[in-house]
Amino acid sequence: MVILDNIRSMHNVASVFRTADGFLLAGMVLCGFTPQPPHRDIQKTALGATESVDWWYVQNTLDAVMNLKSKGYKVFAVEQAEGSISLSNFNTNFTEPLALVFGNEVEGVASEVIAASDGCIEIPQEGM
């Protein structure tokens, strides 16, 4: 499961739909001001994935996180934060379903969402 926390770019949202489709994820939760289908710019980049990936809209990201946790999900924010686990060291031997929260392109994942998450995963990058 993927949770998008106030993503501003329609193209980024569409790319996540395509990735979710490719990995056969259980679904996506779009939160805050994250653009939602149907929209021409999302449809063009998503290439039909908005039809094959289940998605929901929840205004408040923290509500979405707490809802999934109440259903037994382990929730991890993808963010550089104190105590983050490098992706290469992340243990994926969970018996519970997993949800990843991706944050705004500038601000990242909201601090209250990080606090409510079961942890943070950091994806090392060579670029900026």
Task: Enumerate the predicted regions with their spans.
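Post-transcriptional modification and biogenesis factors for structured RNAs
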Residues: 1-128
